[in-house]
Amino acid sequence: MKYMITSKGDEKSDLLRLNMIAGFGEYDMEYDDVEPEIVISIGGDGTFLSAFHQYEERLDEIAFIGIHTGHLGFYADWRPAEANKLVKLVAKGEYQKVSYPLLKTTVKYGIGKKEATYLALNESTVKSSGGPFVVDVVINDIHFERFRGDGLCMSTPSGTTAYNKSLGGALMHPSIEAMQLTEMASINNRVYRTIGSPLVFPKHHVVSLQPVNDKDFQISVDHLSILHRDVQEIRYEVSAKKIHFARFKSFPFWRRVHDSFIED
C-alpha cells in the first residue's frame, strides 16, 4: 500500500512523522507522495485542509487520516500517543471508508476569461473588495433576495462547525448531502431587507450570487483567499466529489462537537 505523511512543520509533528515512517518500514508499505492511497496529516485541521487541497484531484483513490498534535480537530481525531497503534492498523488495511460531502464553487467572469472552479472541504466566503457588498441571490434560477451587508458564507456539513458556527449557522451532520448559506452582518431596515436566517440547500440545488454594481470580490475557499475581478456570477452547489476518511474506530460526529465546544 502506498502512503504519504504531511506535517504541520513544528518539532513535535515532524518528529512524529519520522517515527511513523520508520514504523511503516517494518511492513509492506511504500512511501509515495505522488500517488498515495493513504494520506496522513499530522498537526491540526489547518494541516489537514492543506493535505486535502494537495490531493483534491485524486480524492477517489485516497483515504485521509488526521493526527492532532495540538487541540482536537474535526478532521484530526487521532492522538500522538496512538501513532504506533495507527501504523499497525493502516498496514493491516483494517479500516472502513467514511465519506463527507464537498462544496463546488464556480466563478464566472466577463467576456474572454475562462471560468474558475474550486472545491471546498469547509466553506467558501464572498466579500466586497472594498466598497459595499451588494449581490442578487438566485436559487435554482429564481430570484430570492438582494443582499446587502459584509458578505456571505456557504459551508459544507462538516464545515458548519467552523466559520459558519461563528456566524450563527446551524451545525449539520456530514451524512447530509447539503450546503448552508449564512449572512455576514446583513443590512436590514425599512428600505433593505434580507431573509436574516441561515439557509440549507439539498443536493442538486444551485445558488447563484450575481453582482449588482461592484464586480470585484474577495473570494475564499477554505484557507485560500483571492481577489477576483470582473466577476459576473458565483455559483454554489454540492459537489459530485467526496472526501474519504479511513476510519478504524468509532468517533461519532456529535461526540466530536461535544468535545470541541462543550468539554473534552
Swiss-Prot record:
<dbReference type="GO" id="GO:0051287">
    <property type="term" value="F:NAD binding"/>
</dbReference>
<dbReference type="Pfam" id="PF20143">
    <property type="entry name" value="NAD_kinase_C"/>
</dbReference>
<dbReference type="GO" id="GO:0003951">
    <property type="term" value="F:NAD+ kinase activity"/>
</dbReference>
<comment type="function">
    <text>Involved in the regulation of the intracellular balance of NAD and NADP, and is a key enzyme in the biosynthesis of NADP. Catalyzes specifically the phosphorylation on 2'-hydroxyl of the adenosine moiety of NAD to yield NADP.</text>
</comment>
<dbReference type="GO" id="GO:0006741">
    <property type="term" value="P:NADP biosynthetic process"/>
</dbReference>
<feature type="binding site">
    <location>
        <position position="150"/>
    </location>
    <ligand>
        <name>NAD(+)</name>
    </ligand>
</feature>
<keyword id="KW-0963">Cytoplasm</keyword>
<feature type="binding site">
    <location>
        <begin position="161"/>
        <end position="166"/>
    </location>
    <ligand>
        <name>NAD(+)</name>
    </ligand>
</feature>
<feature type="binding site">
    <location>
        <begin position="45"/>
        <end position="46"/>
    </location>
    <ligand>
        <name>NAD(+)</name>
    </ligand>
</feature>
<feature type="binding site">
    <location>
        <position position="148"/>
    </location>
    <ligand>
        <name>NAD(+)</name>
    </ligand>
</feature>
<dbReference type="InterPro" id="IPR017437">
    <property type="entry name" value="ATP-NAD_kinase_PpnK-typ_C"/>
</dbReference>
<feature type="active site" description="Proton acceptor">
    <location>
        <position position="45"/>
    </location>
</feature>
<dbReference type="InterPro" id="IPR016064">
    <property type="entry name" value="NAD/diacylglycerol_kinase_sf"/>
</dbReference>
<keyword id="KW-0547">Nucleotide-binding</keyword>
<comment type="similarity">
    <text>Belongs to the NAD kinase family.</text>
</comment>
<protein>
    <recommendedName>
        <fullName>NAD kinase 1</fullName>
        <ecNumber>2.7.1.23</ecNumber>
    </recommendedName>
</protein>
<dbReference type="InterPro" id="IPR002504">
    <property type="entry name" value="NADK"/>
</dbReference>
<dbReference type="GO" id="GO:0019674">
    <property type="term" value="P:NAD metabolic process"/>
</dbReference>
<dbReference type="GO" id="GO:0046872">
    <property type="term" value="F:metal ion binding"/>
</dbReference>
<keyword id="KW-0520">NAD</keyword>
<keyword id="KW-0067">ATP-binding</keyword>
<dbReference type="InterPro" id="IPR017438">
    <property type="entry name" value="ATP-NAD_kinase_N"/>
</dbReference>
<dbReference type="Pfam" id="PF01513">
    <property type="entry name" value="NAD_kinase"/>
</dbReference>
<keyword id="KW-0418">Kinase</keyword>
<dbReference type="GO" id="GO:0005524">
    <property type="term" value="F:ATP binding"/>
</dbReference>
<feature type="binding site">
    <location>
        <position position="185"/>
    </location>
    <ligand>
        <name>NAD(+)</name>
    </ligand>
</feature>
<feature type="binding site">
    <location>
        <begin position="122"/>
        <end position="123"/>
    </location>
    <ligand>
        <name>NAD(+)</name>
    </ligand>
</feature>
<dbReference type="GO" id="GO:0005737">
    <property type="term" value="C:cytoplasm"/>
</dbReference>
<keyword id="KW-0521">NADP</keyword>
<keyword id="KW-0808">Transferase</keyword>
